[in-house]
């Protein structure tokens, strides 16, 4: 059994897309903390924040993180999961944390192209490019502090997955169908 692999980074860096591809490449299970949370409370992130505030959402996010953390699982986390010190320590201690790093321009382009963008609550109330820049400035150091590996997420999903697999210890690089020794 291998440690969970946690993907962290801002909105639009590709945590879910890369996570699913990485899980397929490694034979691991895939989990997404935001999706798990939404399916268990039957509300969108925006609805949770509206009803419970960011503090309530962050508490639920921690519960989701603990619930989906399991050996041999790739976990796509919410962009703000690193704001809670407990979450940073937990992920760093329990698993391998990978920061999917991308510049503001890439993040904005991806977010503008997402059909579910309206389901995400604004973090600052500012235009998207300003919000992404501000949020990344506030969180980048926390992503870096938490990560075991920092990966350039501007490439294609296949390239990013290959870079992640190359960075991981050999025991984690087994492809589906390989024999674990």
Swiss-Prot record:
It catalyses: shikimate + ATP = 3-phosphoshikimate + ADP + H(+). One of its GO terms (molecular function) is shikimate kinase activity. InterPro entries: P-loop_NTPase (IPR027417), Shikimate/glucono_kinase (IPR031322), Shikimate_kinase/TSH1 (IPR000623), Shikimate_kinase_2 (IPR027544), Shikimate_kinase_CS (IPR023000). ATP binds at residues 12-17, 120. GO terms for cellular component: cytosol. Pathway: Metabolic intermediate biosynthesis; chorismate biosynthesis; chorismate from D-erythrose 4-phosphate and phosphoenolpyruvate: step 5/7. Substrate binds at residues 34, 58, 79, 139. Keywords: Amino-acid biosynthesis, Aromatic amino acid biosynthesis, ATP-binding, Cytoplasm, Kinase, Magnesium, Metal-binding, Nucleotide-binding, Transferase. It is found in: Cytoplasm. Its EC number is 2.7.1.71. Binds 1 Mg(2+) ion per subunit. The LID domain closes over the active site upon ATP binding. Belongs to the shikimate kinase family. AroL subfamily. PANTHER family: SHIKIMATE KINASE, SHIKIMATE KINASE 2. Monomer. Catalyzes the specific phosphorylation of the 3-hydroxyl group of shikimic acid using ATP as a cosubstrate. This is Shikimate kinase 2. It comes from Salmonella newport (strain SL254). The lineage of its organism: Bacteria, Pseudomonadati, Pseudomonadota, Gammaproteobacteria, Enterobacterales. The gene is aroL.
């Amino acid at each position: 059994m291998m440690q969970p692999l946690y993907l962290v980074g801002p909105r639009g860096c590709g945590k879910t897309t890369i996570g699913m591809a990485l899980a397929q490449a490694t034979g691991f299970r895939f989990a997404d903390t935001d999706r798990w949370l939404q399916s268990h409370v039957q509300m969108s992130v925006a609805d949770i924040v509206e009803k419970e505030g960011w503090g309530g959402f962050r508490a639920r996010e921690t519960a989701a993180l603990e619930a989906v953390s399991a050996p041999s699982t790739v976990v796509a986390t919410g962009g703000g999961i690193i704001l809670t010190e407990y979450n940073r320590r937990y992920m760093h201690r329990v698993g391998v944390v990978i920061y999917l790093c991308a510049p503001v321009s890439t993040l904005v382009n991806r977010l503008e192209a997402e059909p579910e963008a309206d389901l995400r609550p604004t973090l600052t109330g500012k235009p998207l490019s300003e919000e992404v820049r501000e949020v990344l400035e506030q969180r980048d150091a926390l992503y870096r502090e938490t990560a075991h590996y920092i990966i350039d997420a501007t490439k294609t999903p296949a390239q990013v997955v290959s870079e992640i697999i190359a960075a991981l210890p050999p025991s984690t690089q087994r492809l589906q169908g390989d024999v674990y020794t």
